[in-house]
């Protein structure tokens, strides 16, 4: 699956400039959606960092809850961006990528862009959020596979260091994120790393701050209808 | 016909009761105002506020889920 994922992602000709991901056949375009695909608001500012990212940091959204259809996942991405921009005041959605329950990869800030998801790691990491609350439930296989494929693609293309370290958000911040069940899962993945004092950051063994935020304000105006779901 | 006289102890109890009621009222008002949710901005107001806000110059220490750029100066160390 990973090899197939690599081929499919490569076929799309992923562009750092967030071009429309309509290259290749219908199967290929179903894997990675561009910002315009999910109706992203323009970022206020974009700042890049050099070189392949040495860290991959996994998050869960907690809210919005898991989505299983592409239109719902597109809305979830917009909701997260609304929360990060409008309510929190940041320049863009904080994550590099989002993974929906539909198995699609949604481009957030993208590769080599300074994120806003993990203090002190934002300029050297790729932040991937698996949309949903993964405290007690394991994400569906298609989500886990999509996350692994995205990481493999990043390594293949040189956006992620081949010797990268995989972390959960709770290892770099006092938070429950990415949820106990998902954290247990990624702990068994290749490159998962336990951070200790020698690396300058202590791991948090007992997070006390739940990763909870209110639902984004209901829109006064209806969003323009999202683009048609890619053919799978 | 006996003259009705004000009993000093009765007057004292009445004054105390009034005092306690006033205190209770004040406590209730304070509690209500503390618990009352601050008025939420409408979506249009949020968008207007965001539009007027300059970009955050450095987001390396940001956590968009847990921190607010609007309160950045009051963030915990």
Curated annotation (Swiss-Prot), chain A:
InterPro entries, A to Z: Amidase/PGRP_sf, Amidase_domain, Peptidoglycan_recognition, PGRP, PGRP_domain_met/bac
Disulphide connectivity of cysteines: 67-73
Entry keyword set: Disulfide bond, Glycoprotein, Hydrolase, Immunity, Innate immunity, Metal-binding, Secreted, Signal, Zinc
Gene3D superfamilies, per database record: Peptidoglycan recognition protein-like
Residues of the signal peptide: 1-15
UniProt superkingdom: Eukaryota
Region of interest (Disordered), ranges: 213-232
The protein's enzyme class: hydrolase
Function according to Swiss-Prot or TrEMBL: N-acetylmuramyl-L-alanine amidase involved in innate immunity by degrading bacterial peptidoglycans (PGN). Probably plays a scavenger role by digesting biologically active PGN into biologically inactive fragments. Has no direct bacteriolytic activity.
Protein name in UniProt: Peptidoglycan-recognition protein LB
Lineage: Eukaryota, Metazoa, Ecdysozoa, Arthropoda, Hexapoda
